[in-house]
Amino acid sequence: MVRATGSVASRSRRKRVLKQAKGFWGDRKGHFRQSRSSVMRAMAFNYMHRKDRKGDFRSLWITRLNVASRIHGLSYSRLINGLKQAGIHLNRKMLSEMAIHDPQGFAVVATQAKLALEAAVQG
């Protein structure tokens, strides 16, 4: 009976890891054992940061909205509260894009929010 070796599978596994380690520095690029641990670590960081990216973008949008709303005499929290009271359903990403690319449109939205806040205080 022929002796079955795992050479084809082993070689393809090593090639896959070394291919993923392309761009790494020193032994981490060309030596399988070093590459394997570095690739696993890189993949773990990649997974974490894919999750973090969502919150990072939300923070960016909020920062942009805070700056844009202060130009119109509102803080970020008062802008969001006013939008909710006015029944304007725009998410933070869309508002942020609007503040950058369509300042006149954002001014209209901010004015609506301000009017809704004033109406809530009076009524």
Swiss-Prot record:
InterPro entries given in the database record: Ribosomal_bL20, RIBOSOMAL_L20_CS, Ribosomal_protein_bL20_C
One Pfam family linked to the record: Ribosomal_L20
One GO BP annotation of this record: ribosomal large subunit assembly
UniProt key word Transmembrane: no
HAMAP family on file: Ribosomal_bL20 (MF_00382)
Function in brief: Binds directly to 23S ribosomal RNA and is necessary for the in vitro assembly process of the 50S ribosomal subunit. It is not involved in the protein synthesizing functions of that subunit.
Protein name: Large ribosomal subunit protein bL20
Species the sequence originates in: Chlamydia trachomatis serovar L2 (strain ATCC VR-902B / DSM 19102 / 434/Bu)
